């Protein structure tokens, strides 16, 4: 009550922010007459002036009013477009490192030019991040004339660019690119072997377009660069043949109930589980097919990889549907469909062997499983930027998540003109067939009066179902889904014409405005060298059509189903009513829709259906509230999943930072001999401690063991026993020093033979290669640990704390192994000449380039990344067939030493 009263009196936080920014808008507007009087040359010279003032100590915030006024004036001269006051406010919000919620059609692309120009003055580069290549190229080419007029360079960062072109693009003042490509470049740079192979500069300022799509919808998708693991394609095919023999069971087994089905499906968490009967049946089938020995079980350690294949095949058949979750393209490849945008994602593959299982199910060529070489989530990549900001039409529903995870405040920017779109209440039908019949009738009525219609569907399958129904009704229409995405811009340009009907999956076409009356620019672009007279004629024709569409009611939006997220529904609605245009929207639902079926209570469903007749619809506030409640529930669960993923990934992220900082250090210096020397002393001290325990009696010393170890592991002839016999004054500390001095002398002798420079290059090469190999193995070990950590909860332990503790132990082990491996390799290697070092470097570089070419974002399903929800990890590059030997257990070789002090040092 008091809070509401205070808000009325002093305004909300958003209102107060806008009041403060409007004062600066006045300041910018005051510069307008002065800047209008400047010649083009004087206006261009402002960039040089601003850079000089920055060098003299002025801040970007102090320059902001003049810089924004400069961009506005340049835009008027280059495009004939003047930034609205609300766009200036949006630009200031972005410059402050916040999220600007701007409605569709309010000119986000032009708004981004303001903070991009201002921050580019610092000379550190500005990254403008888009969701796909088309938007990156379009926005870069659209804004290039403006930035070049002001003396700024513009670059584009898209996949498959030649290395020199990519490196040059990163030197541009303002760089447009996709989120995937920026993330992959970061990972590739941290696999590079020489400084000149890297492309990225420091990460200074990023403006993320469609920020909700990138930082929330894709937050659960790690970017992974992977290399091929062992080939097991035949096994996928053989296990795939068994899955159709399994029967679904509706209810989980319990103490009171044991069903006769083989698996159960949990639709809420999108998981599938074998029942006890199912496990026994699968084991019988495995034995019959020669995949398992008689009497063996799926859950024995040696069969873990078989269990992994069965789970993957079962999920592929039961949970993943063709034309909904993926399509099979003309080349016979399984291509993932993004559940949020409805776009295909070529090059991305599901992990955990799921992609191979789907390939086996569809009978196409099975590609090898992959092993992770480098990985990062978008959450952690974008947090590397000194300043991060974003734009979207719908961020307010996720404002809490932006604030808690990224520290980004959301500011809702007012529209330039009042919004007059009519959002009608939802209507609910009993069945999907009745719902589609009502949609067809609505479309017919609107087409007859010349009103354009955009129909949003949740999957390719539903869009094709509706398309077939429209064909039967003889209604002309366009389909915009993952199968036709290359025609996207063309279809969107036509979607605002009188009577046009467009079916789009989710947010396909997002980022491109639907202009009422169609796009006159598209018509001009299709003409060869049009005259000004022809352009004016096209504009006049368009104006007549535009007014006709406005009279018919503007663009009408039909939602065929509610999405799990209110934000996606709002995005669909937001396609209509741009720039104060007329428009309307309505969602048609049925009790068979996924959201209502899964999340509406049985009582509510029975209540609704009891009084309904065929073809009858109901509109009810209670039902709308119930649907919104279900959506909030799903959003809350998805937020918890993302938050939990981040908490686990933060552990790996801290380790990633240490490894990448070490790599940076190694690559930035030519001579690491001091580091090698320090490591040699550390490693040898540790080895000597094992055989001559500190402050121990001579009777406890194992001198023969020490001599043998020094010879085998470090190629050092140190007759320790003989030294002691010859010099009875040689005590423990002096003996240690003598062993280390001998090792140093042996290494120096090697240096004299091959030359200091050759050895320096070789040291660096060995250190980098060993670090990369160990890091790759460490990522696999971390995955392995992550997959089973939730089971610790059953032992009354906190899985997160256990994960932190054990991953820290693994990481300590990595650093120790790195030291010992490098010292052992350098001690035993015989470098002949410079050519060998160069050959090794070339080989290592070729491997890194090949891995980089194979870069792929593996789509990890949200559920498989939940620690305490599932026993499947978020990808499974390596499955161990034998039990792992503990570091402190006796070594299997029979030496009597601990594993970590014997063969564990080699492995």
Swiss-Prot record:
InterPro entries: Helicase_ATP-bd, Helicase_C-like, P-loop_NTPase, SEC_C_motif, SecA, SecA_CS, SecA_DEAD, SecA_motor_DEAD. The gene is secA. PROSITE patterns: SECA, SECA_MOTOR_DEAD. Disulfide bonds: none annotated. This is Protein translocase subunit SecA. Belongs to the SecA family. SUPFAM superfamilies: Helical scaffold and wing domains of SecA, P-loop containing nucleoside triphosphate hydrolases, Pre-protein crosslinking domain of SecA. Residues 841-907 are annotated as: Disordered. Its EC number is 7.4.2.8. Keywords: ATP-binding, Cell inner membrane, Cell membrane, Cytoplasm, Membrane, Metal-binding, Nucleotide-binding, Protein transport, Translocase, Translocation, Transport, Zinc. Residues 854-865 have a biased composition (Low complexity). ATP binds at residues 87, 105-109, 513. Zn(2+) binds at residues 891, 893, 902-903. Its cofactor is Zn(2+). GO terms for cellular component: cell envelope Sec protein transport complex; cytosol; plasma membrane. It catalyses: ATP + H2O + cellular proteinSide 1 = ADP + phosphate + cellular proteinSide 2. It holds the Pfam family SecA_SW. Part of the Sec protein translocase complex. Interacts with the SecYEG preprotein conducting channel. Has a central role in coupling the hydrolysis of ATP to the transfer of proteins into and across the cell membrane, serving both as a receptor for the preprotein-SecB complex and as an ATP-driven molecular motor driving the stepwise translocation of polypeptide chains across the membrane. Residues 841-853, 872-887 have a biased composition (Basic and acidic residues). Its main location: membrane. Monomer and homodimer. Part of the essential Sec protein translocation apparatus which comprises SecA, SecYEG and auxiliary proteins SecDF-YajC and YidC. It is a peripheral membrane protein. It is found in: Cell inner membrane; Cytoplasm. GO terms for molecular function: ATP binding; metal ion binding; protein-exporting ATPase activity. May bind 1 zinc ion per subunit.
């Amino acid at each position: 009550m008091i809070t509401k009263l205070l808000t009325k009196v002093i305004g909300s936080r958003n209102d107060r922010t806008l009041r403060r920014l409007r004062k600066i808008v006045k300041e910018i507007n005051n510069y307008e007459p002065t800047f209008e009087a400047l010649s083009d040359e004087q206006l261009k010279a402002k960039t040089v002036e601003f850079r000089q003032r920055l060098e003299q100590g002025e801040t970007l915030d102090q320059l902001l009013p003049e810089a924004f006024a400069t961009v506005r004036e340049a835009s008027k001269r280059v495009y004939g477009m003047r930034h609205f006051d609300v766009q200036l406010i949006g630009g200031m919000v972005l410059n402050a490192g916040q999220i600007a919620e701007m409605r569709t059609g309010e000119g986000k692309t032009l708004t981004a030019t303001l903070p991009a120009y201002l921050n580019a003055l610092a000379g550190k580069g500005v990254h403008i991040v888009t969701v796909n290549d088309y938007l990156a190229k379009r926005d870069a080419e659209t804004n290039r004339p403006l930035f070049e007029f002001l003396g700024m360079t513009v670059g584009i960062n898209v996949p498959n660019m030649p290395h020199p072109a990519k490196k040059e693009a990163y030197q541009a003042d303002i760089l447009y690119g996709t989120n995937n490509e920026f993330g992959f470049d970061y990972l590739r740079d941290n696999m590079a072997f020489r400084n000149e192979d890297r492309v990225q500069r420091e990460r200074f300022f990023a403006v993320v377009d469609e920020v909700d799509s990138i930082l929330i919808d894709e937050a659960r998708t790690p970017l992974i660069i992977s290399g091929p693991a062992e080939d097991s394609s035949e096994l996928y095919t053989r296990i795939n043949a068994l899955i159709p023999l399994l029967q679904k069971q509706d209810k989980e087994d319990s103490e009171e109930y044991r069903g006769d089905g083989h698996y159960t499906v949990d639709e809420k968490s999108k998981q599938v589980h074998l029942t006890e009967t199912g496990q026994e049946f699968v084991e019988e089938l495995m034995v019959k097919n020669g995949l398992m020995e008689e009497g063996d079980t799926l859950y024995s350690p040696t069969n873990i990889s078989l269990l992994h294949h069965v789970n993957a095949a079962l999920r592929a058949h039961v949970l993943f549907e063709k034309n909904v979750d993926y399509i099979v393209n003309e080349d016979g490849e399984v291509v993932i469909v993004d559940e949020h945008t409805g776009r295909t994602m070529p090059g991305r593959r599901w992990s955990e062997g799921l992609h191979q299982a789907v390939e086996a199910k569809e009978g196409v060529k099975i590609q090898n499983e992959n092993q992770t070489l480098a990985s990062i989530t978008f959450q952690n990549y974008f947090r590397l930027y000194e300043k991060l900001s974003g734009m979207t039409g719908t961020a307010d529903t996720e404002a809490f998540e932006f604030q808690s995870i990224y520290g980004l405040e959301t500011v809702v920017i007012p529209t330039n003109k009042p919004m007059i779109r009519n959002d009608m209440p939802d209507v609910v039908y009993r069945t999907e067939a009745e719902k589609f019949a009502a949609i067809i009738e609505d479309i017919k009525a609107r087409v007859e009066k010349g009103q354009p219609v955009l129909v949003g569907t949740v999957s390719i399958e539903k869009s094709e179902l509706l398309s077939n129904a429209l064909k039967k009704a003889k209604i002309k229409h366009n389909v915009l889904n993952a199968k036709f995405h290359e025609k996207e811009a063309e279809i969107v340009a036509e979607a605002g014409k009188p009577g046009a009907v467009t079916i789009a999956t989710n947010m396909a076409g997002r980022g491109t405005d639907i202009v009422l009356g169609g796009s006159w620019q598209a018509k001009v672009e299709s003409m060869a060298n049009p005259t000004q007279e022809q352009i004016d004629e096209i504009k006049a024709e368009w104006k007549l059509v535009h007014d006709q569409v406005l009279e018919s009611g503007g663009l009408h939006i039909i939602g065929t189903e509610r999405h799990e997220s209110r934000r996606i529904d709002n995005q669909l609605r937001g396609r209509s009513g741009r720039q104060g245009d007329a428009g309307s929207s309505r969602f048609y639902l049925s009790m068979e829709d996924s959201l209502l079926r899964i999340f509406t209570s049985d009582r509510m469903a029975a209540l609704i259906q009891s009084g309904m007749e065929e073809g009858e619809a109901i509109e009810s506030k209670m039902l709308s509230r119930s649907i919104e409640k279900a959506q909030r529930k799903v959003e809350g669960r998805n937020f918890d999943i993302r938050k939990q993923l981040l908490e686990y990934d933060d552990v790996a992220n801290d380790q990633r930072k240490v490894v990448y900082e070490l790599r940076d250090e190694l690559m930035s210096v030519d001579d690491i001999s001091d580091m090698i020397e320090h490591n040699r002393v550390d490693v040898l001290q540790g080895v000597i401690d094992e055989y001559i325990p500190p402050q121990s009696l001579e009777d406890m010393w194992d001198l023969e063991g020490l001599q043998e170890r020094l010879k085998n592991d470090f190629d050092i002839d140190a007759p320790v026993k003989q030294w002691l016999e010859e010099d009875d004054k040689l005590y423990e500390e002096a003996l240690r020093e003598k062993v280390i001095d001998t090792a140093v002398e042996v290494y120096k002798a090697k240096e004299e033979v091959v030359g200091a420079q050759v050895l320096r290059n070789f040291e660096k090469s060995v250190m980098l290669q060993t670090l990369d190999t160990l890091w790759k193995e460490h990522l696999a070990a971390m995955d392995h640990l992550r997959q089973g950590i939730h089971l610790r909860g059953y032992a009354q332990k906190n899985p997160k704390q256990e994960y932190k503790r054990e991953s820290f132990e693994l990481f300590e082990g990595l650093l120790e192994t790195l030291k010992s491996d490098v010292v052992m390799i350098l001690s035993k290697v015989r470098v002949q000449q410079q050519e060998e070092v160069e050959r090794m470097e070339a080989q290592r570089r070729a491997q890194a380039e090949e891995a980089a070419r194979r870069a792929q974002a593996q789509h990890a399903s949200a559920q498989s990344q939940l620690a305490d929800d599932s026993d499947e990890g978020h990808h499974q590059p390596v499955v161990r067939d034998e039990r792992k030997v503990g570091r402190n257990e006796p070594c299997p070789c029979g030496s009597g030493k601990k594993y970590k002090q014997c063969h564990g040092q080699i492995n």
